[in-house]
């Protein structure tokens, strides 16, 4: 690993011609940690310990593919002239919202096939997802991407950041806002809140709470970033999607409480699709 002033090599190590990047290692660690945390939640509601294996496997694969497609779509003017770069996901360039869409769709399909209740599974994995996202942002840090606008070294020192973060925010002769860190901290706080409140919330509300919490933080952090995917010259895609997710989640939670009076998560027990108790 090559570490010099202001630079941490994105490549952790090489195996012959194969470069193993910190980006992939960190994302894999986030997924694994999230899986083990979700395993404990499975036991609490009486579901089998292997329930999430297929869901996480397919959601991770489809999520990564859709996340890349999402990113490439909004950067098509570049990729249309660099087609060989499209599959090089290890260089970075995936969009969390794309991954969320792909993971959500595949997760619902697997729940249907496995006869699982999607809201219950969503509540189980929501804290793990936001924690994995918070950890994954450190992959952006290692790749020297997803940072904010220029700042001074004095500004970063005023934040009392560790020296290795300050050094690695020195990119091509300029210090930048560590927006990866802002979002990572926000996500970890969200993880603690969701884990703490999950038992008190109605079925499905932990997942929608995740969407709301993540989207609020992403909206404000995105305004600081210099590499946003743009819908128009003034509209950032991530901010627009965040607003839509907040609105949908709030409306859905209110509607379900008024219309259906859903049961509490802690009282749900093992549920099947759509809401029948498993025998």
Swiss-Prot record:
HAMAP family: Lgt (MF_01147). This is Phosphatidylglycerol--prolipoprotein diacylglyceryl transferase. The keyword Transcription does not apply. The chain crosses the membrane at residues 22-42, 52-72, 89-109, 203-223, 235-255. One of its GO terms (cellular component) is plasma membrane. It is an enzyme of class 2 (transferase). Disulfide bonds: none annotated. It is a multi-pass membrane protein. Its main location: membrane. Pfam families: LGT. Its EC number is 2.5.1.145. It comes from the Bacteria. Pathway: Protein modification; lipoprotein biosynthesis (diacylglyceryl transfer).
